[in-house]
A protein has these predicted regions:
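Cytochrome P450
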Residues: 1-291
Length: 291
């Protein structure tokens, strides 16, 4: 992770304005996803595209209108590509990439017998590995510009970076909500949730709960209970890649702290018009290097 972070940061424009989302957030995420899947490195941006068209579903999320036929064709391209990778892994000894582990795993080796189940699981892994990390990286830069006192605190106390990572994830909350179906009757407070009913969990609302997080709309990098956020879900549905996401963010901010006095946001952030993914499409910045 550090090797990839250093390479990305070392090749950023020194004195020009550039888009932080494309040059850093997306690029780091694409490189890490390609590594996890042992996906052809030169095609890594396809992973980001497939993730974007999976979550940009206008009828469900309010996102921008996409050409439905093109979207379908692109998702079939995704399915075909990963089917090819799967068949390649089946023919080889087990390795440590996710495709190989699933292809040789007792509980997952027959997944391709149901093509839609296979595609659904692949897209779940791609989206899960893309959106949380990518938008927390972008949101963190934006937050430190909105709350300059917190940026000064970071400069003075870099040991706060691990806690800051949790606070940035809480503040950004990249996945806004998730829906589950109750398997049994369950009483929650004064409400009875019956088996078969659908329950929507608003992670963004939970992470702004003033009874848990005082001044919840503020970024506070020394917040004592920052790790109590629910951005990764909870219980058996907690994101299995949460430690990797935190590690990527921690390493990135450690390397940023070594190099830059400030990452200045110099224009308006373009947000993703979506009620499922709380994303940032572009963020113009200029770097101020340490002297």
């Amino acid at each position: 992770i550090r090797e990839r972070v250093v390479d990305i940061l070392s090749n950023l424009p020194a004195n020009d304005t550039f888009d932080w989302v494309d040059e850093v957030s997306v690029e780091l995420t694409a490189r890490m996803l390609a590594t996890l899947f042992d996906f052809p490195y030169e095609d890594r941006r396809k992973l980001i595209h497939w993730s974007d068209i999976t979550t940009d579903t206008p009828e469900l999320t309010g996102a921008e209108i996409l050409d439905p036929e093109q979207r379908k064709a692109d998702l079939m391209d995704c399915a075909g590509t990963f089917m090819g990778l799967w068949q390649d892994r089946v023919a080889r000894p087990p390795k440590f990439d996710l495709i190989s582990m699933m292809a040789h795993g007792k509980d997952t080796q027959n997944m391709t017998e149901n093509p839609m189940l296979f595609l659904g699981n692949i897209l779940l892994l791609i989206v899960g590995g893309n959106d949380t990390t990518r938008n927390s990286i972008s949101g963190g830069v934006l937050a430190l510009n909105e709350f300059p006192a917190q940026h000064r605190l970071l400069m003075d106390r870099p040991e706060l970076i691990p806690n800051m990572v949790s606070e940035m994830i809480r503040w950004q909350t990249p996945v806004i909500h998730m829906r589950r179906r109750a398997l049994a009757d369950q009483r929650l407070g004064d409400e009875l949730i019956r088996a078969g009913e659908k329950v929507v969990m608003w992670y963004l609302s939970g992470n702004r709960d003033e009874s848990v997080f005082p001044e919840a709309d503020r970024l506070m990098i020394d917040r004592p209970n920052a790790r109590s956020h629910v951005a990764f879900g909870f219980g058996i549905h907690r994101c299995m890649g949460n430690r990797l996401a935190e590690m990527q963010l921690r390493v990135l901010w450690e390397e940023i702290h070594k190099r830059y006095e400030h990452i200045e946001v110099v224009g308006a952030a373009e947000r993703n018009p979506n009620n499922f993914i709380r994303g940032i499409k572009s963020l113009p910045v200029r770097l101020h290097h340490r002297r």
